[in-house]
């Protein structure tokens, strides 16, 4: 039986001029024709068998299946084609108009089937009372929550508490939320903390721990008030900020009187070489060893090591350049030693000096 079908297809391909009317069943990457016509290919295959192969199926080398019809009606309904010892009865091929009518009938049939199925679904939803019964909950919603365990008066009480109570957060209040006694107490704590810290000074983080305030803005407001209090009262102390530290210092106007009390002379541990290196770092920070050497024209390693031991400079990371050299900046101790609050108070360099002759380090 399979051989008969193959012979029939071969004869048709060799002898018949196939029509231009084609219906393509393309591969998955190009199935626009199939989607446009919305055909049931299984149904069409059945139709081919029922009509004695009136529509011919041909598979090409590219594995794309196509359906062809014959446009030329030169063949009679009972014309015979001889192939070897076998004679095959060939029915008359369909015309283009017949093919279109056939496709249209398939679409109409499919549409009718869809309408019948839709009508069946609509009939199922006709009974609204049955639908309401299915959607109705098994228990009343109010009955579930109206139990004896819930007291209505307690519920009202809870709502009143939520409405009248104010929620406070640790960092939600400002200086205006503190009364005068609280502000005075905080100032007293700051005074004691500054006295104990001495020349080391205290940072904002230290004051947060002692005062219990968590906002830097709150502390700065109270520190400004405390500084004004010292000025108004003509106190012998002054509150000054050096870098990130706050310190209590004596008034400069009392310098002569205090010099009679302090008779010890202090010797600086810095040589000329170390002072020059420290000055270069202060004016160019953050800076590298190579830049210091380019300015001084000498190897700065001994001076850098000495300044690190004296805690006058610190390592502040590495530069994002080849080799990743270490960056150096001045430390908090630098501000304390030279009485500088910030880098803007450094003496301005004289740009008119064209030559710089450092002291010979052989004497140091």
UniProtKB/Swiss-Prot annotation:
BP terms from Gene Ontology: cell division; chromosome separation
Name of this chain's protein: Segregation and condensation protein B
Subcellular localization(s) per the UniProt record: Cytoplasm
One Pfam match: SMC_ScpB
Similarity comment: family membership: Belongs to the ScpB family.
Coiled coil: none
Subunit structure: Homodimer. Homodimerization may be required to stabilize the binding of ScpA to the Smc head domains. Component of a cohesin-like complex composed of ScpA, ScpB and the Smc homodimer, in which ScpA and ScpB bind to the head domain of Smc. The presence of the three proteins is required for the association of the complex with DNA.
Main location: cytoplasm
InterPro entries in the record: ScpB_csome_segregation, WH-like_DNA-bd_sf, WH_DNA-bd_sf
Functional description taken from the UniProt entry: Participates in chromosomal partition during cell division. May act via the formation of a condensin-like complex containing Smc and ScpA that pull DNA away from mid-cell into both cell halves.
The entry's keywords: Cell cycle, Cell division, Chromosome partition, Cytoplasm
GO cellular component, one term: cytoplasm
